[in-house]
Amino acid sequence: KVNGVILRRRVYFMGRWLKHGGKYPELLLRIFRVGHGMSEMKLMDEHLIVTDGNVVTFKNDFSDNNNKSLEWWINKHNWYSNKEVLDQQMKSDAANGEESVEETSTSMQAKVKRFVKNHGYYSLPKFFRAHLYFIYRYYFRLGFLDGTEGKIYTFLQAYWYRYLVDAKIYECEKLGVKMKSQGDLKA
């Protein structure tokens, strides 16, 4: 019995479909039968999971075509950066025997991305890792083929956002504080 459907996400930025830079295809579980699925209890990068039954992957895409302004996008990612810092602090606490963070997902792509992020990316030195991630996404994953929009998106999402997260982690460590909350999205 099929209880879930995975779709291919097609991201648009400034009106352009981002076909490169590691953005396509992003496989996401987006449809599940009532009573057989749920959302992970995570602050960032949460996924829908199917609790029982089979999951199929459709050939069709769904469009993530947000036509809001760049200012809105930047505000949203500033807000996301607070959530990312909170999430990393919770993972650090879990490694020290405190609250655990669930590591399940129905998508193998999501499992691999999460593993690389938690055991690869976050094991690299702060700030340096943002440089490497941008180079990987823009040059090795061919983000430059998406034109000016691809360059802007990859710089902001793979470099600026990741550098901002590291700056906030650094600030918390320097002051000896924890991120209290993600705050309100001011868009």
PLM region descriptions:
Residues 175-187:
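Alpha-helical transmembrane segments and their immediate juxtamembrane flanks
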Residues 1-172, 183:
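Catalytic-site signature of metal-activated, phosphate-bearing donor transferases
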